[in-house]
Amino acid sequence: MGRRRKGRDISGWLIVDKPAGLTSTAVVNKVRWALDAKKAGHAGTLDPDATGVLAVALGEATKTVPYVTGALKAYEFEIRLGQATNTDDAEGEVIAQSDLRPTEDEIKEALSAFIGDIEQVPPQFSAVKVDGERAYKRARDGEEMTLAARPLYVDSLLLIDRPDADHVLLEMVCGKGGYVRSIARDLGAALGCLAHVRSLRRIWSGPFDAKNAADLETIEALARTPELDAHVQPLETALDDMPEVKATAEGAVRLRNGNPGMVLASGIEYGETCWASFESRAIAIGRYKSGELHPVRVINAPD
């Protein structure tokens, strides 16, 4: 038998304001230790140099991660005009330059082409797999790859500031799977001036906002204390945008065993995804059919 992972059975969400210079996995490991949590994961990777909202799921909350990663997210990012890099961000080597600088009106006009359902090609330095190997590993070896375009929904893309001729501050709200570096690269190409991302910050992700995030200094200072536990948000927070149905006592027993259970619902369409509660606690996520919830995920959070 494998070794049993030590730690507490704690469930919920700790929202971290990730600093630059750490991987998302490193932040999750710090949170797991600080809370002495048995299980933890995150809802959407941030590049090491990016900052902002990293939603860390604890315990049974990890079962709700797909519903957060699929939600809209907002990013604020600064673009450096006039330079292309091999990584599409400031960490890479400058591989081409341009003296052309577009006007604000030209930038605003170009942004409109990136709104709605678009296709974007991931950066060469990305975690996309090519023949079973991460693209960034091949790129580090000097290989140039043809990566397939991927669909992305962009809800909005706005010009926030133009501090000088070389820099533009943008804010984007988008769906799952977007590469901000690709947006910068493609915008620079569309404007004919080249561009890369200089800085990137995620300001919210689904129901989680940077305004309610804890920084790592605070988390480490409060490690293994009730004060840090007080920062943990309920598991149900991740389900704010999903309709709720209430399980009957008998239905709750059936749902907890992974079987369809009777629920009380109003205005829920047949086949709609929703979550069931019993005594104000989430117990299952599934699809509503004729007065019953057919569970896809069963939640067994500790009291």
UniProtKB/Swiss-Prot annotation:
Keyword Protease listed: no
Keywords from the named record: Isomerase, tRNA processing
GO biological process: mRNA pseudouridine synthesis; tRNA pseudouridine synthesis
Active site: 47
CDD domains according to UniProt: PseudoU_synth_EcTruB
InterPro entries: PsdUridine_synth_cat_dom_sf (IPR020103), PsdUridine_synth_N (IPR002501), tRNA_psdUridine_synth_TruB (IPR014780), TruB_C (IPR032819)
Its job: Responsible for synthesis of pseudouridine from uracil-55 in the psi GC loop of transfer RNAs.
Protein family (similarity comment): Belongs to the pseudouridine synthase TruB family. Type 1 subfamily.
Name recorded for this polypeptide: tRNA pseudouridine synthase B
Name of the top EC class for this enzyme: isomerase
Gene3D superfamilies for the chain: Pseudouridine synthase
Organismal lineage: Bacteria, Pseudomonadati, Pseudomonadota, Alphaproteobacteria, Rhodobacterales
The keyword tRNA processing belongs to this UniProt entry's keyword annotation: yes
Enzyme Commission number(s) of this protein: 5.4.99.25
Origin superkingdom: Bacteria
Catalytic activity: uridine(55) in tRNA = pseudouridine(55) in tRNA
Molecular function GO terms recorded: RNA binding; tRNA pseudouridine(55) synthase activity
